[in-house]
Amino acid sequence: MVIIHGAGSRKENHGDFGRACAAAGWAALAYDQRGHGASEEEMGPAALGDLGRMARFVGSIDDVDPDRVCVRGSSMGGFVAIHGAATSDAIRAVVAICPAGEQHLLQGLRSGSLEMRAGPQARAALEAWLGEHDLRQAVELLGAKPLLLIHARGDERIASEWSEELYRHAAEPRKLIVLPGGHHHSAQHDAELQGLSLRWLERTISN
């Protein structure tokens, strides 16, 4: 399992899911996206390639089946997870929690509310790259790769209707969970949902 955080976050914030993976017998890797945490790089379009490399690395670990490497991304991490899975054969399935669309990321980038380290050139490159991508199309490109979408109805940053729209673009196997209430960060740290995610992945990637 490759775990991808959102904007303004870092890998340590998802340690609870990493521990849940380990307890369920999954190898798990969380990393700092560019422009975050201990990463020395500025955030930019190369972030997508980083995910593919991380997935291949996890698949190369002893006792890890390279055909069962999955990704879980939250918010901006959900955007990267879906696009990464749509373009990399190293990724088998996706869990996206309150995934941000390119429109949400562009709005945050232009308003300055998107927390990340990126200078003017990096921000310009990121804005141009986001303008060329559509998360709905990426969902369609997943084809038969399993997609689990989780969203809190009370999300104050990204409306849950966005995940409902993405779900309509997804092929089977797919699953959408919309939680009553909550907020932008509540679903990613819910222990029950973490267990449900892993069980759903086990069932779908074993078929």
Task: List where the protein language model places each region.
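Hydrolase active-site cap/lid region
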Residues: 83-128, 186
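Alpha/beta-hydrolase fold nucleophile elbow
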Residues: 63-75
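Short beta-strand/loop motif that positions the catalytic acidic residue
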Residues: 142-143, 149-151, 155
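Catalytic histidine-centered segment of alpha/beta-hydrolase-like enzymes
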Residues: 182-192
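Short beta-strand element of the alpha/beta-hydrolase
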Residues: 1-6
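Conserved alpha/beta-hydrolase "acid-adjacent" motif
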Residues: 156-162
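Alpha/beta-hydrolase active-site loop
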Residues: 13, 42-62
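The serine-hydrolase catalytic nucleophile loop
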Residues: 7-19, 33, 41, 161
